[in-house]
Amino acid sequence: MTYEQLLQQATQKVVSYDKEESAAVLLLESVADLKANELYLKAKEKVKKEIVKEFNALLDRYLKQNEPVQYLIGKSCFYGYDFIVNPAVLIPRFETEELVENVLYRYDRHFKGQELDVLDLATGSGCIGITLALEEKNLHVTATDLSEDALEVARTNNKRLQAGVTFLQGDMLEPLKGKKFDIVVSNPPYIPLNEEVMPLVKDNEPHLALFGGEDGMKFYRIILSGIAPYLKEKAMICLEHGYDKKEEMIRLAKTYFPSAKVEVLKDLEKKDRMTFIYVGDFKWEN
Protein backbone atom coordinates (compact mmCIF):
# COMPACT_ATOMS: atom_id res chain seq x y z
CA MET A 1 0.00 0.00 0.00
CA THR A 2 1.30 3.48 -0.90
CA TYR A 3 1.11 6.59 1.27
CA GLU A 4 -1.49 7.99 -1.11
CA GLN A 5 -3.69 4.88 -0.83
CA LEU A 6 -3.34 4.73 2.95
CA LEU A 7 -4.30 8.39 3.28
CA GLN A 8 -7.29 8.02 0.93
CA GLN A 9 -8.52 5.03 2.92
CA ALA A 10 -8.08 6.88 6.21
CA THR A 11 -9.77 10.03 4.91
CA GLN A 12 -12.87 8.06 3.89
CA LYS A 13 -13.03 6.59 7.37
CA VAL A 14 -12.63 10.03 9.00
CA VAL A 15 -15.40 11.48 6.82
CA SER A 16 -17.71 8.62 7.79
CA TYR A 17 -17.25 9.66 11.44
CA ASP A 18 -17.90 13.31 10.53
CA LYS A 19 -14.48 14.36 11.82
CA GLU A 20 -11.67 16.59 10.59
CA GLU A 21 -9.98 15.23 7.45
CA SER A 22 -6.74 16.99 8.39
CA ALA A 23 -6.44 14.63 11.36
CA ALA A 24 -5.45 11.74 9.09
CA VAL A 25 -2.67 13.81 7.55
CA LEU A 26 -1.32 14.94 10.93
CA LEU A 27 -1.35 11.40 12.31
CA LEU A 28 0.40 9.92 9.28
CA GLU A 29 3.03 12.67 9.23
CA SER A 30 3.75 12.00 12.89
CA VAL A 31 3.93 8.20 12.66
CA ALA A 32 6.08 8.27 9.50
CA ASP A 33 8.18 11.15 10.89
CA LEU A 34 7.53 13.30 7.83
CA LYS A 35 7.11 17.03 7.37
CA ALA A 36 4.05 18.37 5.54
CA ASN A 37 5.60 18.54 2.07
CA GLU A 38 7.42 15.23 2.43
CA LEU A 39 4.19 13.25 2.75
CA TYR A 40 3.03 14.36 -0.69
CA LEU A 41 6.47 13.80 -2.22
CA LYS A 42 6.30 10.19 -0.99
CA ALA A 43 2.71 9.69 -2.18
CA LYS A 44 3.58 6.82 -4.56
CA GLU A 45 6.04 5.11 -2.23
CA LYS A 46 5.10 1.97 -0.32
CA VAL A 47 4.46 2.32 3.40
CA LYS A 48 6.22 0.02 5.84
CA LYS A 49 3.89 -2.43 7.59
CA GLU A 50 4.81 -1.17 11.07
CA ILE A 51 3.88 2.39 10.05
CA VAL A 52 0.50 1.21 8.71
CA LYS A 53 -0.16 -0.69 11.94
CA GLU A 54 0.75 2.22 14.24
CA PHE A 55 -1.13 4.74 12.09
CA ASN A 56 -4.33 2.67 12.07
CA ALA A 57 -4.12 2.19 15.84
CA LEU A 58 -3.87 5.95 16.42
CA LEU A 59 -6.61 6.65 13.89
CA ASP A 60 -8.91 4.27 15.77
CA ARG A 61 -8.18 6.09 19.03
CA TYR A 62 -9.03 9.39 17.34
CA LEU A 63 -12.25 8.09 15.79
CA LYS A 64 -13.56 5.59 18.33
CA GLN A 65 -12.17 6.86 21.64
CA ASN A 66 -12.51 10.53 20.70
CA GLU A 67 -8.94 11.45 21.67
CA PRO A 68 -7.59 14.77 20.31
CA VAL A 69 -5.04 14.48 17.52
CA GLN A 70 -2.68 16.83 19.35
CA TYR A 71 -2.50 14.51 22.36
CA LEU A 72 -2.05 11.46 20.12
CA ILE A 73 0.93 12.98 18.31
CA GLY A 74 2.14 14.80 21.43
CA LYS A 75 2.42 18.25 19.94
CA SER A 76 0.50 21.27 18.68
CA CYS A 77 1.61 24.06 16.36
CA PHE A 78 1.27 27.55 17.86
CA TYR A 79 2.49 30.74 16.17
CA GLY A 80 4.76 28.64 13.93
CA TYR A 81 6.37 26.74 16.81
CA ASP A 82 5.78 23.12 17.79
CA PHE A 83 4.76 22.80 21.44
CA ILE A 84 4.68 19.51 23.30
CA VAL A 85 1.22 18.88 24.73
CA ASN A 86 -0.36 16.12 26.79
CA PRO A 87 -3.54 15.77 28.88
CA ALA A 88 -1.96 17.89 31.64
CA VAL A 89 -2.29 21.03 29.51
CA LEU A 90 -4.86 22.75 27.34
CA ILE A 91 -4.37 22.42 23.59
CA PRO A 92 -3.41 25.90 22.28
CA ARG A 93 -6.14 27.66 20.28
CA PHE A 94 -6.02 30.01 17.29
CA GLU A 95 -7.63 32.77 19.36
CA THR A 96 -4.67 32.70 21.71
CA GLU A 97 -2.32 33.25 18.78
CA GLU A 98 -4.28 36.45 18.20
CA LEU A 99 -3.72 37.42 21.84
CA VAL A 100 0.04 37.01 21.38
CA GLU A 101 -0.05 38.95 18.11
CA ASN A 102 -1.89 41.83 19.75
CA VAL A 103 0.51 41.92 22.71
CA LEU A 104 3.47 42.14 20.33
CA TYR A 105 1.79 44.85 18.25
CA ARG A 106 1.07 46.95 21.33
CA TYR A 107 4.58 46.39 22.66
CA ASP A 108 5.88 47.93 19.43
CA ARG A 109 3.39 50.76 19.68
CA HIS A 110 3.92 51.70 23.33
CA PHE A 111 7.28 50.26 24.44
CA LYS A 112 9.31 49.61 21.27
CA GLY A 113 12.96 48.82 22.00
CA GLN A 114 12.51 48.76 25.78
CA GLU A 115 13.42 45.78 27.95
CA LEU A 116 10.29 44.76 29.84
CA ASP A 117 9.28 42.27 32.51
CA VAL A 118 6.30 40.17 31.38
CA LEU A 119 4.06 37.91 33.45
CA ASP A 120 2.19 34.98 31.86
CA LEU A 121 -0.43 33.86 34.39
CA ALA A 122 -1.79 30.28 34.19
CA THR A 123 0.74 29.39 31.50
CA GLY A 124 -0.30 25.77 30.80
CA SER A 125 1.93 24.50 27.98
CA GLY A 126 3.84 27.79 28.10
CA CYS A 127 2.76 28.73 24.60
CA ILE A 128 1.98 32.40 25.36
CA GLY A 129 5.03 33.29 27.43
CA ILE A 130 7.48 31.23 25.39
CA THR A 131 6.23 32.68 22.09
CA LEU A 132 6.47 36.24 23.41
CA ALA A 133 10.05 35.61 24.55
CA LEU A 134 11.01 34.09 21.20
CA GLU A 135 9.35 36.79 19.10
CA GLU A 136 10.69 39.77 21.08
CA LYS A 137 14.06 39.41 22.77
CA ASN A 138 13.45 42.50 24.95
CA LEU A 139 10.67 40.70 26.81
CA HIS A 140 11.83 38.91 29.97
CA VAL A 141 9.05 36.48 30.78
CA THR A 142 8.00 34.91 34.07
CA ALA A 143 5.25 32.28 33.79
CA THR A 144 3.16 30.74 36.57
CA ASP A 145 0.80 27.81 36.96
CA LEU A 146 -0.89 25.97 39.80
CA SER A 147 -0.33 22.57 38.18
CA GLU A 148 3.14 21.07 38.57
CA ASP A 149 2.30 18.64 35.74
CA ALA A 150 1.54 21.57 33.44
CA LEU A 151 4.76 23.32 34.46
CA GLU A 152 6.73 20.19 33.60
CA VAL A 153 5.34 20.42 30.05
CA ALA A 154 6.02 24.17 29.90
CA ARG A 155 9.61 23.75 31.11
CA THR A 156 10.19 21.07 28.49
CA ASN A 157 8.90 23.39 25.76
CA ASN A 158 11.02 26.23 27.12
CA LYS A 159 14.15 24.07 27.02
CA ARG A 160 13.44 22.73 23.52
CA LEU A 161 12.79 26.18 22.10
CA GLN A 162 15.49 27.90 24.19
CA ALA A 163 13.17 30.73 25.18
CA GLY A 164 14.69 31.63 28.55
CA VAL A 165 11.37 31.88 30.41
CA THR A 166 11.35 31.64 34.23
CA PHE A 167 8.64 29.42 35.77
CA LEU A 168 6.99 29.68 39.19
CA GLN A 169 4.54 27.21 40.73
CA GLY A 170 1.58 28.57 42.67
CA ASP A 171 -2.05 29.64 42.61
CA MET A 172 -2.48 32.69 40.34
CA LEU A 173 -0.85 35.69 42.13
CA GLU A 174 0.52 33.65 45.05
CA PRO A 175 4.14 33.19 43.84
CA LEU A 176 4.69 36.82 42.76
CA LYS A 177 5.81 38.39 46.04
CA GLY A 178 8.36 41.16 45.50
CA LYS A 179 8.01 41.17 41.71
CA LYS A 180 6.67 43.86 39.38
CA PHE A 181 5.78 43.67 35.69
CA ASP A 182 5.31 45.94 32.68
CA ILE A 183 2.98 43.51 30.89
CA VAL A 184 0.62 40.93 32.36
CA VAL A 185 -0.91 38.46 29.93
CA SER A 186 -3.27 35.59 30.65
CA ASN A 187 -5.68 33.17 29.05
CA PRO A 188 -7.20 31.82 32.28
CA PRO A 189 -9.95 29.18 32.47
CA TYR A 190 -13.14 30.94 31.37
CA ILE A 191 -15.85 28.41 30.53
CA PRO A 192 -18.83 28.69 32.95
CA LEU A 193 -19.43 25.50 34.93
CA ASN A 194 -22.93 24.98 33.52
CA GLU A 195 -22.01 25.64 29.88
CA GLU A 196 -22.25 22.73 27.46
CA VAL A 197 -18.81 21.71 26.21
CA MET A 198 -17.93 19.49 23.24
CA PRO A 199 -17.18 15.92 24.43
CA LEU A 200 -13.79 16.00 22.64
CA VAL A 201 -12.79 18.89 24.92
CA LYS A 202 -14.62 17.95 28.13
CA ASP A 203 -13.53 14.30 28.10
CA ASN A 204 -9.85 14.94 27.38
CA GLU A 205 -8.56 18.38 28.34
CA PRO A 206 -7.81 19.33 31.97
CA HIS A 207 -10.86 20.81 33.71
CA LEU A 208 -8.50 22.94 35.82
CA ALA A 209 -7.60 24.80 32.61
CA LEU A 210 -11.15 24.96 31.22
CA PHE A 211 -13.67 26.06 33.81
CA GLY A 212 -13.80 29.51 35.38
CA GLY A 213 -16.46 29.20 38.07
CA GLU A 214 -20.22 29.61 37.85
CA ASP A 215 -20.11 32.55 35.43
CA GLY A 216 -16.69 32.02 33.84
CA MET A 217 -15.36 35.20 35.48
CA LYS A 218 -13.77 33.78 38.63
CA PHE A 219 -10.15 34.17 37.56
CA TYR A 220 -10.61 37.64 36.05
CA ARG A 221 -11.88 38.81 39.44
CA ILE A 222 -8.85 37.25 41.14
CA ILE A 223 -6.43 38.80 38.65
CA LEU A 224 -7.87 42.30 38.45
CA SER A 225 -8.62 42.63 42.17
CA GLY A 226 -5.10 41.62 43.17
CA ILE A 227 -2.66 42.47 40.40
CA ALA A 228 -2.07 46.18 41.21
CA PRO A 229 0.83 45.62 43.68
CA TYR A 230 2.67 43.66 40.97
CA LEU A 231 2.41 46.32 38.26
CA LYS A 232 5.01 48.89 37.37
CA GLU A 233 3.97 52.54 37.07
CA LYS A 234 3.13 52.07 33.39
CA ALA A 235 1.70 48.64 32.68
CA MET A 236 -0.49 46.75 30.25
CA ILE A 237 -2.86 43.93 31.26
CA CYS A 238 -3.84 41.65 28.35
CA LEU A 239 -6.58 39.06 28.85
CA GLU A 240 -8.31 36.53 26.61
CA HIS A 241 -11.91 35.77 27.60
CA GLY A 242 -15.27 34.42 26.47
CA TYR A 243 -16.79 36.18 23.46
CA ASP A 244 -19.88 37.22 25.45
CA LYS A 245 -18.03 38.84 28.37
CA LYS A 246 -17.25 42.29 26.92
CA GLU A 247 -19.44 44.35 29.26
CA GLU A 248 -18.44 42.34 32.33
CA MET A 249 -14.74 42.73 31.49
CA ILE A 250 -15.09 46.50 31.03
CA ARG A 251 -17.02 46.81 34.29
CA LEU A 252 -14.45 44.74 36.17
CA ALA A 253 -11.52 46.66 34.69
CA LYS A 254 -13.06 50.02 35.58
CA THR A 255 -13.84 48.82 39.12
CA TYR A 256 -10.20 48.13 39.92
CA PHE A 257 -8.52 50.54 37.49
CA PRO A 258 -10.94 53.48 37.15
CA SER A 259 -8.48 55.80 35.40
CA ALA A 260 -7.13 53.18 32.97
CA LYS A 261 -7.98 53.03 29.28
CA VAL A 262 -9.81 49.80 28.45
CA GLU A 263 -9.76 48.33 24.95
CA VAL A 264 -11.80 45.29 23.87
CA LEU A 265 -10.50 43.56 20.74
CA LYS A 266 -12.26 41.20 18.37
CA ASP A 267 -10.85 37.94 17.08
CA LEU A 268 -10.82 36.95 13.40
CA GLU A 269 -14.42 35.76 13.72
CA LYS A 270 -15.42 39.29 14.84
CA LYS A 271 -16.10 38.12 18.40
CA ASP A 272 -15.09 40.16 21.46
CA ARG A 273 -12.22 37.98 22.62
CA MET A 274 -9.56 40.13 24.34
CA THR A 275 -9.47 43.00 26.81
CA PHE A 276 -6.39 45.21 27.14
CA ILE A 277 -6.11 47.51 30.15
CA TYR A 278 -3.59 50.36 30.04
CA VAL A 279 -2.48 51.52 33.49
CA GLY A 280 -0.43 54.71 33.80
CA ASP A 281 0.91 57.17 31.24
CA PHE A 282 0.18 55.84 27.75
CA LYS A 283 0.29 58.16 24.74
CA TRP A 284 -2.57 57.86 22.29
CA GLU A 285 -2.90 59.15 18.75
CA ASN A 286 -6.02 61.18 18.03
Residue ranges and their predicted role:
Residues 1-73:
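N-terminal auxiliary segments of SAM/dcSAM-dependent transferases
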Residues 1-16, 107-115, 177-178, 261-263, ...:
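Short, Lys/Arg-enriched, disordered terminal segments
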Residues 20-21, 111-115, 232-233:
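Short helix-terminating capping/connector loops at secondary-structure junctions
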Residues 56-136, 141, 146-156, 276:
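SAM-dependent Rossmann-like transferase core, predominantly class I methyltransferases
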Residues 139-140, 144-285:
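S-adenosylmethionine
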